[in-house]
């Protein structure tokens, strides 16, 4: 073994050895027996290699010699003499002589140049692999010298004679371990023919099979502005340490305006500072810290399809792993042709070595633009792409475009990546920088070859023709993954749904060819050759070539970081990398495929525990659903969901989940590989897969509602109220409310009951039924009704009469309306009344409008309808007929105000409302007889309800669903707040019952109205929501004539109404006109429900009842695009967690209506709950309310009791429970007071204790002590021990003491309003704002 110490030997001896070797090589060449000169003359070769840097010099000389030595006619002696001359010449390591010699040789015999070049290149490749020389005795052994020490030109010589053979001989000779060890710099001995090593290493020295160029881009960074692009990658990437890449270029940014930066570019330097080795956050910080002005980015732009990650991470390994196809390159970097080809300067594979020494100045670059070119015909390596005008290289004039960089400062670069070569060039020390390049004797030929290679690379990218490259990349990835990249592969597999790996394989192939069946996990049945490398290659080629595959790759890149990986995946398959690697590759491909279509929800993927089975199941399901079983798309989607499951699912979860129910979705997605449509289609499939139907159904239903939030009973209530005032609504309500309710029940039922949901959803199609109901119901709009007309009182009387007079509610329409309301109320009542049901359940049921009822939809409807019928019984039968005609038909006839008395007797507020407007009382005769035919008794009412339910109720139910769509009722904030306020289960049950009952009854009315007004629009789905809103708004507009700005309903009125009912006092009619509106709504409820409700209300203590006072449902009538007249403050992301009214604009709608006040908590807007939302989301909901012509706002005044309860509910369950405890304890003992303190620079003059997470647990925030001399001490407005409920409009429930102090600090100096709860009944100096 030669030791490295030999590297210090004199250059002369090395030169002589090289000369002798050149002579031997010449002899060997002339024999042209194809055997390696290394094998024939191992000692000289080994010796030359052993010389280290000296060897390098000699190598160059030898290269010259070998190039001539080829099949040249020049005698060996001539070569020797030339070599001697070079030796003698040699100052500066004889570089100039070498250059002259090379040129001379090229002129004398161009044919020799080719072999020399071939050898040089092969040796170069050898060097990266064999970093250390091992055994001198073995001529075929890999040279262990590090690449920097190896004289690769010489090695190239040695390899040159083997030009022909490298194609077949050397491709796979080198073991993986050897290849890995050598690049790592290990000195492990490997007995291999040098040529095989060189061939194995001939894989693109550029470090990637994709052509890429390094260039500088100057961008202008403005003040407080970015550069207009986002980045991914970093050494902390889940795929392993990778560079920083451009992910997205934003339109309108600096990068887009410049136009040179491309997505997928690797950022090497920022203002001259290297980005290598940075984590993602570090890179972001670098960009953020960059000062405004001109920024210089050094980027590597790929001219072809993105390469595999492995190529980035370990290019040398990748190259060494190249397959036999790459071997051809090793024979000569530019020559695929056999070396025996006749020597001719015109031959493109001929090369000469030229050394150029450039003088580098401090702080100035050399001006050499580099590019790496994948193997193409006879070209591969790192080349001079451009020379900057005026630069050192340009002025020197010796370097040409198309020159291949062979060595820089005595360091071979064939084993280096483009990035590494750039780093070497850019960081050279000032002074002479020797560069050895290889070029064709005619520089123009080299330049043309480079251009063609780049153009071909681009073409390959476009048409996916890089099969061999891919296979090579695959091999590279395979070996590289084994060597140090396994983590990257593993991460890919993990991220890309490892359970589906096999299927993913198949999917990749299938995805590459959408026509393939990916049912078989191993490969699509159609692509049985998938296992075969060639077929795999083709398939992979197709997949990358397909825009779908690549675009998805880009999408996956966001997740996987590098878009470049997509092509390598197929390659890995071609090269038959380990299954794991193949899978990972396929996974990457699938990701892109799936990325286009929205990924199905994770649930769907979870269901498929076995990737193959799941794939097969998906195929089966897809087949059953009529979709092709292509699992590739499915798997891709599965992978995507895993990668991007929640976002995509959130966007499409309803439909996608419906589509995803199980295997079915996957196939559908595949069939619709292009994207979302497939998912939509998958929804039917979801039905086919019962397992996921329930969840999917719910999601689908949510989709239909176009709001993921739960329906808001308050919104419905408000809508109902609007409709109540509008006779049209009441009329429409007859028909529509029942059906809409049914549809709601069905949809809700689907949500509540996954099993039942899918069919119901299918039957209803989410919205169709509702639409139908809307269509079925057509009613003329009547004049607007005042918010609290006399009919309210009458309705109260009627309600009371209802108890006394069973004929009071006979009107079938009324009964029908009450039926849905009563039914829903019954559901809510069931929820609330059932003591067994938990508050949360009640809340959820309340939010979903009796989701608990959903299981018993039919029964509940019937029971509710009969109950409503019974409730209606008390009303007059004659009225029953009228209302049935009016409401049931939703016919143009309007109620006459004269009839309000009858309406009151019937007790249907809607009817009374309709009459008040002066709408013609006479219902369509057809309907009247129908309703009349039904006996007034409960049975007839049930019949009427059933019949009307079929006609009107179905629509009514649908209308609620429409309403939900129009106003996403998915979230019922007020309901949630009440129900979530677990302070007292009684209070919440009552609130849920009342709100649900009112909401349902009102919903029936408004839904009918909206249905009548927009019978067809609701069918459109999302439009129905807006349309229904607009319709209701139109109705409201009719009402607005009487109520210009709108009206408000206080839940306390409902409470009083229930009390009035219990007391049966008619005096209350006049006293509680507003209450009567609520009472009129309640009148729709069945007597049984009312009795139960009354009983529960009786049980409630006053403190709990008082909490109802603060909740108001306000309906504002406005023009489209008009604001609501108030602004919002607070949010889950702010100190003030509760969304409150920040300011009421003087001339706005809210100010004109008068109910909404500054500081009120906003529970929901147009059915969208604001509970737990961020400030930004709340503002977005507020802006969305501009579109409809009606706005329904549920607010809660900061009354002493209502506010804390609400706050507690909004803050958290724990705080809510704590607040509930407090409220329960303090109901009889505590007094809620509002005080005003002056905030000074020193604060409010008191300290706090308690709070969430205190030493004593979650306690309310209380005043600990009052500072002496403070205004609070002098005024004695507050006392130690007082609980702070609200401070400056910010609820303090559930806050930590630190958060409370931050709120106090943030308050402006001046008067501050504080709501406190004092445990003693004596509230001396406070204003009893919360006693009510």
Swiss-Prot record:
Molecular function in Gene Ontology: CD4 receptor binding; cytokine activity
Residue intervals of the PDZ domain: 216-302, 355-440, 1112-1197, 1234-1319
UniProt-reported outcome of changing residue 757 to A: Reduces phosphorylation. Enhances nuclear localization
Repeat as UniProt keyword: yes
Source domain of life: Eukaryota
Classification via InterPro entries: IL-16, IL-16-like, PDZ, PDZ_sf
A Pfam family that the UniProt record links to this protein: PDZ
Protein purpose: Interleukin-16 stimulates a migratory response in CD4+ lymphocytes, monocytes, and eosinophils. Primes CD4+ T-cells for IL-2 and IL-15 responsiveness. Also induces T-lymphocyte expression of interleukin 2 receptor. Ligand for CD4. Isoform 3 is involved in cell cycle progression in T-cells. Appears to be involved in transcriptional regulation of SKP2 and is probably part of a transcriptional repression complex on the core promoter of the SKP2 gene. May act as a scaffold for GABPB1 (the DNA-binding subunit the GABP transcription factor complex) and HDAC3 thus maintaining transcriptional repression and blocking cell cycle progression in resting T-cells.
Subunit structure, interactors included: Homotetramer. According to PubMed:9699630, the formation of a homotetrameric protein complex is not required for the chemo-attractant function. Isoform 3 interacts (via PDZ 3 domain) with PPP1R12A, PPP1R12B and PPP1R12C. Isoform 1 interacts with PPP1R12B. Isoform 3 interacts with GRIN2A. Isoform 3 interacts with GABPB1. Isoform 3 interacts (via PDZ 3 domain) with HDAC3. Isoform 1 interacts with GRIN2D, KCNJ10, KCNJ15 and CACNA1C. (Microbial infection) Isoform 3 interacts with HTLV-1 tax.
Protein name in the entry: Pro-interleukin-16
Species whose genome carries this gene: Homo sapiens
